Amino acid sequence: MNGNQKLDAYNQEKQNFIQHFSQIVKVLTEKELGHPEIGDAIARLKEVLEYNALGGKYNRGLTVVQAFQELVEPKKQDAESLQRALTVGWCVELLQAFFLVSDDIMDSSLTRRGQICWYQKPGIGLDAINDALLLEASIYRLLKFYCREQPYYLNLLELFLQSSYQTEIGQTLDLMTAPQGHVDLGRYTEKRYKSIVKYKTAFYSFYLPIAAAMYMAGIDGEKEHANALKILMEMGEFFQVQDDYLDLFGDPSVTGKVGTDIQDNKCSWLVVQCLLRASPQQRQILEENYGQKDPEKVARVKALYEALDLQSAFFKYEEDSYNRLKSLIEQCSAPLPPSIFMELANKIYKRRK
């Protein structure tokens, strides 16, 4: 398959995935929309789903489907099993939506995926907390509806619950490392940064979609999952460093969001690298300006990052990390096809959104 054919196939898969969303909404809402007691709440759920689950890149959800198609022999890929793979892919997207709606409130974010954050919409506000919980609850309703009779049902339930817990522990580390209104640069170490990323991003963004497909394909051995986890945790760190870079140096018209890591006092890759390179005077500039909403102070921090040439440091990191990933995939992917991991790595390498 040449580059254009691959792109066409990917776009077709993406279209199929997006089309399945209407089925997801139907299963979650259709029966109860006219319910005399909870009809209004179900209409709200439908609105929450349609606003918050759509509009992303769908990488996590599509990864489930693509990995399932690679791991399951073609004769076992009937219409029903593909429906289940699409649904589990959407469960990963709903988990992502649950995290993003919550995260945007905690970070006082303004935009997400090129539109105003859900909680910022008139009449929504902190009711969005309950909406986020509805998104999470929808995952388990879908898994029960589509997968209850499957041998992997319990493994999927445990995987989603574990993914939520890991991510929430990561978010706790993130919030504790950077409490609002209190800047302590001593907390921003590489060790703490790696811990936050491992728990907050890598597990649900990379291991969850691949592990879900593995369970659906009947691959449930500890060794296979441990090897996949090793590769995917490394990939998750690579992805988060990119995210931190794009938060400040990305183009909001491409990324779909306006970054706030400096204002939010975040333990981001950029601030960790800045501290490793800064002179005492430069550290003082960071002390005086980091973690504050004033646009002039934010601009001073950005100027400091530019003076330390953190953009070049990022490009070097991206190259080194990609090469490290390739060797790790060669060493650890068996018995899974290396292509599963390489396709994922190539999808995020040099991404700009």
Swiss-Prot record:
User: What biological processes does GO assign it?
Assistant: cholesterol biosynthetic process; farnesyl diphosphate biosynthetic process; geranyl diphosphate biosynthetic process
GO CC aspect terms: cytosol; mitochondrion; nucleoplasm
**Which compartment or compartments is the protein found in?**
Cytoplasm
Reactions catalysed, as given in the entry = isopentenyl diphosphate + dimethylallyl diphosphate = (2E)-geranyl diphosphate + diphosphate; isopentenyl diphosphate + (2E)-geranyl diphosphate = (2E,6E)-farnesyl diphosphate + diphosphate
Q: Which UniProt keywords apply?
A: Acetylation, Cholesterol biosynthesis, Cholesterol metabolism, Cytoplasm, Hydroxylation, Isoprene biosynthesis, Lipid biosynthesis, Lipid metabolism, Magnesium, Metal-binding, Steroid biosynthesis, Steroid metabolism, Sterol biosynthesis, Sterol metabolism, Transferase
Q: Which InterPro entries match?
A: FPS1-like, Isoprenoid_synthase_dom_sf, Polyprenyl_synt, Polyprenyl_synt_CS
Supply the Gene3D superfamilies for this chain: Farnesyl Diphosphate Synthase
Q: What does the record's cofactor remark say about binding?
A: Binds 2 Mg(2+) ions per subunit.
The membrane-spanning stretches of this chain are: none
Q: What is its main location?
A: cytoplasm
Binding-site residues for dimethylallyl diphosphate, renumbered to this chain: 112, 200-201, 240, 257, 266
| Activity control summary | Inactivated by interferon-induced RSAD2. This inactivation may result of disruption of lipid rafts at the plasma membrane, and thus have an antiviral effect since many enveloped viruses need lipid rafts to bud efficiently out of the cell.
- Annotated residues that bind Mg(2+) 2 are located at 103, 107
- Entry binding sites for Mg(2+) 1: 103, 107
Pfam annotation, one family: polyprenyl_synt
Residues with PTM N6-(2-hydroxyisobutyryl)lysine: 57
Site residues (Important for determining product chain length), renumbered to this chain: 98-99
What is annotated about its quaternary structure and interactions? Homodimer. Interacts with RSAD2.
Q: Which family does it belong to?
A: Belongs to the FPP/GGPP synthase family.
Question: What is this protein for, i.e. what is its function?
Answer: Key enzyme in isoprenoid biosynthesis which catalyzes the formation of farnesyl diphosphate (FPP), a precursor for several classes of essential metabolites including sterols, dolichols, carotenoids, and ubiquinones. FPP also serves as substrate for protein farnesylation and geranylgeranylation. Catalyzes the sequential condensation of isopentenyl pyrophosphate with the allylic pyrophosphates, dimethylallyl pyrophosphate, and then with the resultant geranylpyrophosphate to the ultimate product farnesyl pyrophosphate.
- Its protein name is Farnesyl pyrophosphate synthase
Q: Give the originating organism.
A: Mus musculus
